[in-house]
Amino acid sequence: MSSPTPFKMRLVHLDLKGAPPKVSYLSEVFPLFHALGANGLLIEYEDMFPYEGHLRLLRAKHAYSPSEVTEILRLARLSELEVIPLVQTFGHMEFVLKHAAFAHLREVALFPNTLNPHEAESLALVQAMIDQILELHRDVRWLHIGCDEVYYLGEGETSKQWLQQEQNSHAKLCLSHMQAVASHVLTQHPGVTPLVWDDMLRDIPQEQLKASGVPQLVEPVLWDYGADLDVHGKVFLIGKYQECGFQRLWAASAFKGATGASQALPPVEHHIRNHELWLQVAGSGPKDALQGIILTGWQRYDHFSVLCELLPVGIPSLAACLQSLVHGGFAEDVRLRAERFLGVSSLEIADTVSEGAGSFPGSDIHALVTQISLHLRSSVDTLLERNRYVTGWFSPYHRRRKLVHPVMIQHIQPEALSLLSRWNNLVQQLEVALQPVFYPDTIEEWLEENVLPSLQRLQDLLQDLGEAAARQPPPTSPGWDTGQNP
């Protein structure tokens, strides 16, 4: 018998700093999220938010309009999904600090990761961002203000001077900025409670945390995406945070985007195990210690990294993870329920994903991306590196010199043309499937990263073969000379 979930709130994270879906696709997946057991969304807009005024330059090319944000919120309400917006206010500020207009606010001049907390203009900047986001999210109960992975904090020139004073420390520097940002949220937007990622808090001594006043201002989100999550360590951390005075705590797991910056297919078994371990944490710690859990679905590791798993490709993993949370584990009956929701005949969690098509929104993308990711590069590798005619008679040595035995053209060319035709056909199908879901720049980026390098290798082989075939007279061996007399 499945046990009920210990997590009252179960939020799906939408990471919009890469491959942001069109609103029409969100209208299709929100009801599925709800059916699978989600009751909230953490929306990380990054450069997809329609910032105005001096912040307008933060907008991406295809940023949502204010009316589209309003529509997203309406669609979320229809599916009974409570929205928590997320805005980075300390680390991961690349989408802001990459711009020349804000580069002077970097903690380290060379790196756009982290905001300089000593500049009054830095605080004014994040306050303006918060105010614009909450202007369009008037009914929210929480705002996530980020504050994770604040790399290079303390390494700026102003910080180095500040840290030379005896009473100052990296922890104090971090907590003071967190306090300033959270205080702005609480004073200017009563009723909205700030959430923060917890990694910058973990190693701060208990007494210092308690004395900072931060536990009265924010609710930490304990994040761990591993399949080897330390249950006892997390239970200990929960106890530490509670003793410091934090009123509420949250957990964060991952259903995709946590196992490799260029990962194309989510390892479902890894993600299910991560959720099973979080269930153990919730069951081992104080009752109701965790307010809820955020199922993160990262789309880029940071603003400058490549895309990882696309949202439609991650939906089977999300289904398995949400159903695990709702039913207290991923027993056989839970697997069958997940398969019914997805319209798949088999959810192969031991493999990367199931290759079978489903009936969920974006299932055609899932099926095509799976085929391409599992077989495109390997099929080209097989032809170029293990086909005996290519390796024996049209090696890189031959190709550079445009040398080929005429009979080998008949052995190599038909197979290469057939392979190229097959993959071109599948890629065209994928482009058609991607167009209703994603904007053109996302499609271009995904294909250029995941498809074009392999297709280019095939095309280069065929071009070299054609040029070698056109040479007259054909050489008799790779050692064929130029015909000059000694």
From Swiss-Prot:
The active site is at E149. Ubiquitous. GO terms for molecular function: beta-N-acetylhexosaminidase activity; hexosaminidase activity. The keyword Cytoplasm applies. Belongs to the glycosyl hydrolase 20 family. Its EC number is 3.2.1.52. Inhibited by O-(2-acetamido-2-deoxy-D-glucopyranosylidene)amino N-phenylcarbamate (PUGNAc). Inhibited by galacto-NAG-thiazoline. One of its GO terms (biological process) is carbohydrate metabolic process. Its main location: cytoplasm. It holds the Pfam family Glyco_hydro_20. It is found in: Cytoplasm; Nucleus; Extracellular vesicle. Optimum pH is 5.5. Transmembrane segments: none annotated. Keywords: Cytoplasm, Disulfide bond, Glycosidase, Hydrolase, Nucleus. Residues 467-486 are annotated as: Disordered. Homodimer; disulfide-linked. This is Hexosaminidase D. Optimum temperature is 37 degrees Celsius. InterPro entries: Glyco_hydro_20_cat (IPR015883), Glycoside_hydrolase_SF (IPR017853), HEXDC-like (IPR038901). Has hexosaminidase activity. Responsible for the cleavage of the monosaccharides N-acetylglucosamine (GlcNAc) and N-acetylgalactosamine (GalNAc) from cellular substrates. Has a preference for galactosaminide over glucosaminide substrates. It comes from Mus musculus. It catalyses: Hydrolysis of terminal non-reducing N-acetyl-D-hexosamine residues in N-acetyl-beta-D-hexosaminides. One of its GO terms (cellular component) is cytoplasm.
